Every structure is written in C-alpha cells, then in structure tokens.
Amino acid sequence: MSTEFFWRLPLGTDGPQLSTDRHNRGNPHHRPGNIAPGRLPNGDSDGFTYIDYIAQVAKAAELAGFEGALLPTGPEPWIAAAALARETRRLRFLIAFQATWTLPAYAAQQAAILQHLSHGRLDWNIITGGNPASQRAQGDFLDHDQRYQRTGEFLDIIQGLWNNERFSYNGNIYRLENGALPPHLGNERKPGVYFSGFSDPALDVAARHADVYLNWAEPVEQLKPHIERVRELADKQGRTVRFGLRVDLFARETEDAAWRDLRRQFDKLDGKPSTLSKAFTSTSDSVGGARQTAYHQNIQRFDDLIIGPNLWAGFAKAKPGPTVGLVGSHENIAERLAEYRDAGFSTFILAGNPHLEEALRIGQEVLPLVRQAPVASLPLTASA
C-alpha cells in the first residue's frame, strides 16, 4: 500500500515557536503579526492578507512533495480550500468538517461543486466535536453519543446521494425525501472520509464509513491494539480501512540540536500552558483527547515528557492540538515514521512551526528517507 503525506495548513496563526502567544505572523481576523506586520512605512496596509500567507504554505507543501494539506477547524476551511485550489495544481485538500455546520444534502452539493472546480482534489476530515462549550456556542446541544449518531446519519446520506440518482432516508436525526445531486455533478469523486475517535460510538461510525481512520501519535505499541479493534469492526462491515497518523515534528540537523532548541522554547513557557491550549483541554469530552492529555497532565519537567525514542508529550502545553510529537534529526524522524508505517499506517498528516519553512525542510530532508526505507512488515489493514 502506498504512503501519502499531508501537511497541516495553519489556519489559526503561525510563527517560529511552538507557542504563538508571543510571536506570530498574523491571523485570519486581520490582526497584524508582530513578525510580518503587513504594514507600509506610513502605517497603511500593504494588501498582503493572512490567506496570502496560507497560500504560500500550500504552494511550499506542493513543491516539497506532499500529496495534500489538512485544513483544520478554524475560519471556514471550505472557503479557504476553494481559494487555495486556484493557487495550486495537484495538492489535495483535506477539509475538517462537522455535521452540525450544515445539512447533509447541501454538504454533498457543496462537495461535488468543489470537486468539479478543483478537478477532484477534495477530501473530508470528518470531526464530531470534542468540546461541549464550543458546540453550544454554535447552537449544538447534543451530547457526546448523540453527536456521533448524527455524524453516522450524515455520512449515510452522503453515501446514499452519491450512489443513487434519488435517495430517501428516515433516521433519528435526519430525514430526506427524494434527494439528489445535480445531474452534472453526479460523476464527481465522493470525498474520501478521514475520521477519528476512540469511543465506542466513534468506532461504530469509523467501521461503517471511514476510508482512513486517523490517530494522534502515541508509542506504537500503545496504538496497535486499538488499530486491531478498528480492523476487526471494519471487517465485520465487509470494508477496508486504511490507517493514518497526525503528528507534529520538531526536526533539526542533529538530534542534540533538536532537543536543545525544544528545551529552550519549553523553558520560555514558564510552566504555563498557552491560553488556547488550556481552554481547549479543560472543557473537552473527547475520549481520544483524554488519552493525549494523560501523557502530559500534571507533568512540568521537560525530561518527564519524553515517553519513547524521539517521542515528546509536551506539544499541547504550547498550543491546542496533538500532545505527542516527534523530536530529533531528519534521520531520527524518518526512522520513527517508518516504524509507524511498518505498524500499518499509510497516511501521515505532519506539521511543524513555522509551517512555511518546515514544509520545505520536511519535504526535502525527511519524506525521501521514509519513502526509500524498506518496508519491514505487511501493513495492518482491514480486508474486505
């Protein structure tokens, strides 16, 4: 099975440090960055907006050999993807998307149109929401299990619309009568479904609908039993599921340089998590998020966050998102990624600050090493 690599696009903000609380390159809300302020000497805007910066990151990822880019939750990833499709030629866009944001029939039509305009470069990172406070702020008052039920029904309808000229559905949350895609869009490729979640309701949805089941990084041996369970559940559905890994990287020329620079940045946090990270972890009901939090909760010493070869569990102390990341030389990082690949992972969603420069560096220095490394074992995938 071939390996695919995605690069995360920093839709929120970006900067040279793990934490962007102090140093950043602006954000989509037109806050000027304190690194590249976007101002002319007379104080006027230079007309360069944050989406222009994101476009540079996307072009860098494409140039560096990444197959696609993740557009995480943030200021409307759909619109950003439509803009970036005009700036790139082959880069696929993995759009983070929640069922609560729109009705499934309309989402299917939106996806088909974007597939048509981008020549089939759209995939979905279907998320269900792991922060009840954030969900309520969007008008979503369903509990954890109900949200996954909605996601499952949402994907039932998407599948039905794509596979039938007319489709009706009668679920607990959604109903549809004689729905259809516009005739001229019916032949567009259905977006691939990249899905994650550790709870039982999440695994049920994954078994029925996921093309790629995503995990946050943990020690390989900790992930193997969980992957095996997903494989068995998918097999009962007669489906094949591939496995993916989301992981932040901190790569330098040498391993010593990587750990030294990371320690320096960690010390600047003064033992305090970033504002966004603290708000994210304190209100989450995500089972997968709880697994990540357990690796760093109540741990303040840098060395105590080292949980395996080149594995460090302190990334979430600087920013929201994955806790465990890879730290080391380009060769170290490539070796660890190859180990995950040999354990059955064929999709990798990578990231590193600053995203523009690191896309080029990782693409040039790390990806070729992973692609050239011999496969040590057969991939662990669900078989039809």
Language model feature labels by segment:
Residues S2-S45, Q138, H144-R189, E218-R341, ...:
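An alpha-helical appendage that flanks or caps ligand/catalytic pockets
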Residues W101-H116:
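Glycine-rich anion/phosphate-binding loops
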Residues E76-A81, P219-A234, H355-R361, E365:
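Active-site-adjacent beta->alpha loops and helix N-cap segments on the catalytic face
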Residues A61, G65, L84, L114, ...:
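Conserved, mostly hydrophobic/aromatic
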Residues P10-G12, G74, Q98-T100, I127-G129, ...:
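Active-site beta-loop-alpha junctions enriched in small/polar residues
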Residues T3-L9, G68-L71, R92-F97, L122-I126, ...:
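Hydrophobic faces of well-ordered beta-strands that scaffold small-molecule active sites
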Residues G47, D52-P72, V205-Y213, E339-S346:
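Catalytic domains of carbohydrate-active enzymes, especially glycoside hydrolases
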Residues W78-Q98, R150-G152, D235-R239, F243, ...:
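Alpha-helix-loop-beta-strand connector modules within alpha/beta enzyme cores
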